[in-house]
Structure formats: C-alpha cells, structure tokens
C-alpha cells in the first residue's frame, strides 16, 4: 500500500551561509574564551552569533526585556524563517489558524534564565523575576513562543528525545497531518548554548580536547582521529504540509516524506 504524499518546505538558520560552508568545507567551530576561563577540557564550541539588531527583527522590545534564553532565541528565528520561506504570511489577527500547529523540540532550554532566577530567589528578589520567567524556562517555551507569534490553533507541543529530538518532531508532525488532524505543521528543534549546558558532557570526557589550538579541525565525526564531539547549539525548522494544500498555493517544495518510524534509539 502506497504512503500518502506529504511535502516539506525547509529552512535551516542561515541557509545560504550554511550551504556555502558545507560546499566549501568552512567550519563554524571557534575557540571559546569562556570555556577556557572555566577550565573546561574542551575549549572550542559552535555558538551562533546573534546580533541585537537581528533579534529585533523577530522580537519586540517588550519581549526582549529580561530575555535570557538562547534556545528560544534560536528556535524562534529558525521557525519564523522557515514559515516565511514556505510562503506563509505572519499576520496579527484575532482568529487562530486551526489547521496549523507546531511540534518543536528541545533538549534543554532556558538554563541561563534558570540560573538568573535562582540567584534572584536566593537574594529574596522573587518579585523581580519578571512575567516571562516561566515561558523562558519551561521545556515547551519554544513551541509556546512560536504558537503565539504565528497564531497557531492546532496542536502546540514540545518533544524531547536527546539527539533524535529534531527527527522525532518531523515524524510527529508528519503523523499529525497523515491522520487528518492538521493541514500543516511547523516542526524542528533547538538547543541552548553555554557552559551550564555543556559542563556535564565535558565532565563525561566525551568532548574533544585535542583541537583547542585548531578549532576548525575539532568536528570530525567520521574520522579515525575523532576524539569526541564539539559542544554546539542552534536550531533547525521545517514546514510540513499536505501535498494538495502546498500545490494549491504554489509553495516552494524541497522534499517529500514517505514515512518513518521511532524506536528505542541508542539505549542499551
């Protein structure tokens, strides 16, 4: 029996630059002075550089007040860029889009905001946490932000399954459409950056420490000389949509999903 055909509209954060880097072997891994200061064994990282000017293209001044969650920052940028690349409008109206939802995953998000909040609470400054502390630190914060910005009225969920989170979100979104419960789904995943996320991995000694002097050579997962992974962060997003719907509105179509499956992953 043939699978129904669904289509994907894809955009990865900085798609043009990312594609150029892959084609030309350009590494985004750099020396991380903060990891050196904190005496990490691995002192290189892949951290997106987001300028304040760029942030203002995706968040209002009010939203950026007391904002301190890189995972949500990366996810919102990737999600909104994917939405626009799919030819979908970003509108401010009172009517939710009941046919569209999001399943956007994260491993850990808002750790810096957690740290900030803990210090304020311990200093008896709970009232200074701000009204967005919860949204920035809850796992489903990224899907809540995207759902709110895009007015999504269908399922708004965050999944979390370590390294398979992004792939799992695609399959979950695909199944939602396949079951006839949604016309389109914004899917993807995001991850915070910083030492409080990466410290545990450094302690496990699974991060490379042999390339601190040559960061661009640190990420080499398929090499016989690989000595561990490089702590990194960022986000990726896709718009999944019914074939008929995508064709009817002349959407840019990148690929087709025929099916998929989720098992127990790498657990022993």
Listing of model-derived features with the role each one plays in the protein:
Residues 9, 59-80, 129-138, 156-171, ...:
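Active-site pocket-shaping loop/turn-to-helix segments
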Residues 123-130, 171, 175, 179, ...:
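Glycine-/small-residue-rich "gating" segment that lines the acyl/pantetheine channel
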Residues 3-11:
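Low-complexity basic/metal-binding stretches
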């Amino acid at each position: 029996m043939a699978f129904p055909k669904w289509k994907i509209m894809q955009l990865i954060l900085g798609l043009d630059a990312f594609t150029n880097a892959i084609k030309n072997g350009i590494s985004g891994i750099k020396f991380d002075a903060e990891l050196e200061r904190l005496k990490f064994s691995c002192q290189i990282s892949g951290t997106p550089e987001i300028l304040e000017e760029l942030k203002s293209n995706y968040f209002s001044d009010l939203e950026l007040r007391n904002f301190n969650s890189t995972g949500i920052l990366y996810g919102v940028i990737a999600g909104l860029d994917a939405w626009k690349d799919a030819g979908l409008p970003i509108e401010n109206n009172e009517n939710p889009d009941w046919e569209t939802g999001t399943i956007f995953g994260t491993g850990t998000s808002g750790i810096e905001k957690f740290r900030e909040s803990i210090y304020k609470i311990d200093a008896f400054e709970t009232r200074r946490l701000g009204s967005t502390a919860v949204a920035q630190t809850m796992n489903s914060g990224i899907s809540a932000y995207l759902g709110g910005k895009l007015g999504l009225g269908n399922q708004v969920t965050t999944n979390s399954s370590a390294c398979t989170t992004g792939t799992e979100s695609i399959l979950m979104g695909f199944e939602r459409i396949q079951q006839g419960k949604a016309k389109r789904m914004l899917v993807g995943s995001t991850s915070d950056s910083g030492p409080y996320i990466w410290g545990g991995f450094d302690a496990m000694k699974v991060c490379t420490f042999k390339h601190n002097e040559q960061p661009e050579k640190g990420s080499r997962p398929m090499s016989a000389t690989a000595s561990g992974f490089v702590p990194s962060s960022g986000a990726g997003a896709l718009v999944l949509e019914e074939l008929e719907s995508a064709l009817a509105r002349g959407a840019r179509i990148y690929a087709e999903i025929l099916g998929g499956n989720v098992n127990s992953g790498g657990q022993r």
